[in-house]
C-alpha cells in the first residue's frame, strides 16, 4: 500500500510540476497500464522509452505490488490522479 501511495504522489508531483507544459500522453498511458492494465500491456507501453533491464525489473515489481490491490482501489487511484491533473492547481 505504501508503494501505491508513493507512486501516486510521485506521479502527481511530476504531472503538476510548473516546469511541465502539459501531460505527456505516453506517460499517462504508461501510468494507466501500470494501474489498470495487464503486466504484458504495461511492459509493452514501456518499450518505446527503452528502459534498461534494471528499470524494467523494478517497474514489473511495482506492477506486481499494485496488482495485489483490489481493482476498485486501483481504479480510484487512477481517478484521483486524473482529478488532480485536471485541477486548476496543476494548470
UniProtKB/Swiss-Prot annotation:
A Pfam family of this chain: Uteroglobin
Lineage: superkingdom: Eukaryota
GO biological process: signal transduction
PROSITE patterns the UniProt entry points to: SCGB (PS51311)
GO cellular component terms listed in the entry, alphabetical order: cytoplasm; extracellular space
Xref: SUPFAM superfamilies: Uteroglobin-like
GO molecular function terms attached to this record: phospholipase A2 inhibitor activity; steroid binding
Induction conditions: By progesterone.
InterPro entries: Secretoglobin (IPR016126), Secretoglobin_1C-like (IPR043215), Secretoglobin_sf (IPR035960), Uteroglobin (IPR000329)
Chief localization: secreted
Tissue: Synthesized in the uterus and lung.
Signal is among the record's keywords: yes
Signal peptide residue numbers: 1-21
Biological role stated in the UniProt entry: Uteroglobin binds progesterone specifically and with high affinity. It may regulate progesterone concentrations reaching the blastocyst. It is also a potent inhibitor of phospholipase A2.
Assigned protein family: Belongs to the secretoglobin family.
Subunit text: Antiparallel homodimer; disulfide-linked. Interaction with LMBR1L is controversial.
Protein name as it appears in the record: Uteroglobin
Lineage: Eukaryota, Metazoa, Chordata, Craniata, Vertebrata
Amino acid at each position: 500500500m505504501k508503494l501505491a501511495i508513493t507512486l501516486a504522489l510521485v506521479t502527481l508531483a511530476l504531472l503538476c510540476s510548473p516546469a511541465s507544459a502539459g501531460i505527456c500522453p505516453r506517460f499517462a498511458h504508461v501510468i494507466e497500464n501500470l494501474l489498470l492494465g495487464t503486466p504484458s500491456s504495461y511492459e509493452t507501453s514501456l518499450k518505446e522509452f527503452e528502459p534498461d533491464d534494471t528499470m524494467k525489473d523494478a517497474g514489473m515489481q511495482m506492477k506486481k505490488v499494485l496488482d495485489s490491490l483490489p481493482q476498485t482501489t486501483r481504479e480510484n487511484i487512477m481517478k484521483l490522479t486524473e482529478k488532480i491533473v485536471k485541477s486548476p492547481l496543476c494548470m
